[in-house]
């Protein structure tokens, strides 16, 4: 009987995962959030829901749109924790940031979109410009390569420059994201054996 209970407990614990979302940090200026938003939208995030008539357009402010964009980017990168850094302007959360009418994806499959992404410029855009078309994997919203400042490189332990320079699309490695689940399963198994 004990082996059966242990087996069922192990299956129960191994099957439990908690969803993760990425959101912009509080206390940052709108200009910093706008740069983060532009980067995420210009590098593969599905920002269409934040456009006028989109399900996540309201509230129409930089923070809300930034939250949706960085989460979309994070989900498209397979929830790799380093893809939610944006040089310190975003953070991981286990609290669902969705609100009435706007569902934030909690997995890569829930973050749809392919091909080109249309990015709505910020308030400081030249008059007459309605949108900028960028393509996944390229076309950074910045001119040139930043070298200093909040969004620049110039970090001694980084391997690249920009908001998220160390993200790797390498998927052959193994990462243990929910180590506390493994520890809890091991502890429960040990208790069951005694």
Curated annotation (Swiss-Prot):
Factors inducing expression: Down-regulated by heat treatment.
Source taxon at top rank: Eukaryota
Segments for region (Disordered): 106-140
Location within or outside the cell: Cell membrane; Cell junction, Plasmodesma
Lipidation (GPI-anchor amidated serine): 171
Regions of compositional bias (Polar residues) in chain numbering: 117-140
Tissue specificity note: Expressed in the shoot apical region and in young leaves but also detected in the laminar and vasculature of mature leaves.
Protein name: PLASMODESMATA CALLOSE-BINDING PROTEIN 2
Organism per entry: Arabidopsis thaliana
